């Protein structure tokens, strides 16, 4: 109780019907996420033709999403059943840490997937091919940096606390400069910087794809045929398709996490607008991003 901010005590208990609705949503989300990401990992690891350096990043993405839902799903179900957080202060901190860690690892994995597509499509033969060693180094870097940032609240730079009485996360209601400085930097690290890199890469990817397609049409017109699709062109077309998949995946991630980012910033600067209902659904909606990735890659 000592970790719960006074802000949450001013609100009456939520409508009892909200919890069954939340429980059903989490049940569907949890099953889809665990099954989808497990299948993704299994297929990529057991199909020799798919065991490429670039797909190591896809496997890492599926693993971080699987870990997120594996650790978030059961506690959320318990919370929905009892209508409040009942798992204690220590597990609250561990729960929040794992959620932040997996979210951070997922977004940076998708950023590196996007950068790899940028390297292949925009730079072409001039770009350095992604090797297994380089992909492994990227993945190691992602997890080391993610752990470094997410472990900081355990050492006094911000802290993990209950939010909305049903979940746990970073302390965005604290008014001290040290706590807020963590949220400023962390928001930049897991949202604004990845977004900037993603937009930059996709702008040039789209330009490269458009230029390639125009060149293909012009060449076909000169040869007096309707299309020009040799083996190299088909390969380029496949790369472009993968770029669209990566773009869709990253876009869905940002759509999922933007509400939670806004909750953090509203909590810092306009907490009177922040109710448990908004917090809970923003939090749950953010976790649902782990469902999107296997669906997008399965369609491909």
Curated annotation (Swiss-Prot):
Where can this protein be found? Cell projection, Rhabdomere membrane
GO CC terms on record? cell projection; plasma membrane
Q: Which residues cross the membrane?
A: 19-43, 56-78, 93-115, 135-155, 182-203, 245-266, 278-299
Q: How is it modified after translation?
A: Contains one covalently linked retinal chromophore.
Q: Which residues carry this modification: N6-(retinylidene)lysine?
A: 287
Residue stretches in coiled coil: none
Entry function: Photoreceptor required for image-forming vision at low light intensity. Can use both retinal and 3-dehydroretinal as visual pigment. Light-induced isomerization of 11-cis to all-trans retinal triggers a conformational change that activates signaling via G-proteins. Signaling via GNAQ probably mediates the activation of phospholipase C.
- Name by which UniProt lists this protein: Rhodopsin
Specify the species.
Answer: Cambarus maculatus (Freckled crayfish)
Underlying gene: RHO
């Amino acid at each position: 109780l000592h970790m719960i901010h006074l802000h949450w005590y001013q609100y009456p208990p939520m409508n009892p019907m909200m919890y069954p609705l939340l429980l059903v949503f989490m049940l569907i989300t949890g099953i889809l996420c665990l099954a989808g990401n497990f299948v993704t990992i299994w297929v990529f690891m057991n199909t020799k033709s798919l065991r490429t350096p670039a797909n190591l990043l896809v496997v890492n993405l599926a693993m971080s999403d699987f870990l997120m839902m594996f650790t978030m799903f059961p506690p959320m179900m318990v919370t929905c059943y009892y209508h409040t957080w009942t798992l204690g202060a220590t597990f609250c901190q561990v729960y929040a840490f794992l959620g932040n860690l997996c979210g951070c690892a997922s977004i940076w994995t998708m950023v590196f997937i996007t950068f790899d597509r940028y390297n292949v499509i925009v730079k072409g033969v001039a770009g350095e091919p992604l090797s297994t060693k380089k992909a492994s180094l990227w993945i190691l870097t992602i997890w080391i940096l993610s752990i470094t940032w997410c472990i900081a609240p355990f050492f006094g730079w911000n802290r993990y606390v209950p939010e909305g009485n049903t979940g746990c996360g970073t302390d965005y209601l604290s008014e001290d400069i040290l706590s807020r400085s963590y949220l400023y930097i962390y928001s930049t690290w897991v949202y604004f910087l990845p977004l900037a890199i993603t937009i930059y890469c996709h702008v040039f990817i789209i330009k490269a794809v458009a230029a390639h397609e125009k060149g293909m049409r012009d060449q076909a017109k000169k040869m007096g045929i309707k299309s020009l699709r040799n083996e190299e062109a088909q390969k380029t077309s496949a790369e472009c398709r993968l770029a669209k998949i990566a773009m869709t995946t990253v876009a869905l991630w940002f759509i999922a996490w933007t509400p939670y980012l806004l909750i953090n910033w509203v909590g810092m600067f306009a907490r009177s607008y922040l109710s448990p209902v908004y917090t809970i659904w923003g939090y749950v909606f953010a976790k649902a991003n782990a469902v999107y990735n296997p669906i997008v890659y399965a369609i491909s």
